[in-house]
Amino acid sequence: MMHTRYSRQILFAPIGEAGQKKLMRASVLIVGAGALGSWAIDMLARAGVGKMKIVDRDYVEESNLQRQQLYSMKDVEQKLPKAVAAKARVLQINPSVEIEEYVMHADASNLEPLVQSVDLILDGTDNFDTRFLINDLAVLHKKPWIFGACLGSYGSTLTVIPGVTPCLQCLIRSVPMQTMTCDSMGIISPAVGQVVVHQVTEAIKILLGQTDALRNTYLYFDLWNHEQMSIKISKAKMEDCVTCGTVPTYPFLQFENQTKTSVLCGRDTVQIRPPQALSFSTEEIVKRLTEL
């Protein structure tokens, strides 16, 4: 079966038969099964990644279908959780993939055991409080993770290798307040796809053990205006970083530092959890990195 299903991928020299076997033994945690997460799950399943753990609290809605893979009107009508619908679709695409679905809000207590049990974490979220939580857990447990974000025609991604690269905290000192979401600014599907192709390519390199082939940049683009920047990040690493510095405190593993309000992208819904007001823009990251 391996030689038939993955024959074209095996022909790609950096993968080959040995690499394909590594992918089939690999395990990935995908936090968020919305726009980014659903595309990533689809690609990883087709690539033959052996085990995936999917975390998402949301349900499939009709407005999701414009930009999210895996889901259908039948899932909307049945009011299926995204994690459940994603698992069902993946098993149709590639029955050999082992899927664990978790319909739950991601917090430190329930994410930590999942992080400990996988090879890599992929960010499919739509809010920065969860991303900073992933960042803390990934660095604490020395697990590589791949950040991704998109809005409108913009997108960005960063690969974090604990102990080697700067982490997300090095680039952003505080959690951004989500002043704009896809509910207010909109989003086009190609922007989602552009982020995910970079995320999944980096993920495959890591799972193959080919970290020397990683991009090692913060990638930022605006598809609509034909703009792209790939900025070196090596100088962004901070000795006093609260997550990856010399004396880490992992602040987002502490309840009082977790953001309390989430706008659920694609739904007229706000989830309120206990407070912290902060500010951020993607342009701010780009400006900071280009000044280093």
Briefly describe each language-model feature range.
Residues 1-292:
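Adenine nucleotide-associated cytosolic modules
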